[in-house]
Curated annotation (Swiss-Prot):
Keyword Ribosomal protein listed: no
Family to which this protein belongs: Belongs to the NOP10 family.
Gene this chain is encoded by: nop10
Function recorded in the entry: Involved in ribosome biogenesis; more specifically in 18S rRNA pseudouridylation and in cleavage of pre-rRNA.
Protein name: Ribosome biogenesis protein Nop10
Endoplasmic reticulum recorded as keyword: no
GO CC annotations on file: ribonucleoprotein complex
Length: 60
């Protein structure tokens, strides 16, 4: 089994455990997703990000 370092979103501490040993919050994997030039969902993810942030092309 490969261990990945995890980070607590509440207190910001790093650990290898599923729950934070300090505050008890569920931890998240601290590594970003793997990059692929042939990303099949990249277009949709970028479109959603533009919509959520309110940036991008203006509709005429």
């Amino acid at each position: 089994m490969r261990f990945r370092i995890r980070k607590c979103p509440k207190c910001g501490r790093y650990t290898l455990k599923e729950t934070c040993p300090v505050c008890g919050e569920k931890t998240k994997v601290a590594h970003p997703p793997r990059f692929s030039p042939e990303d099949p969902y990249g277009e949709y993810r970028r479109r959603l990000k533009r919509e959520l942030l309110g940036i991008g092309r203006k509709e005429k």
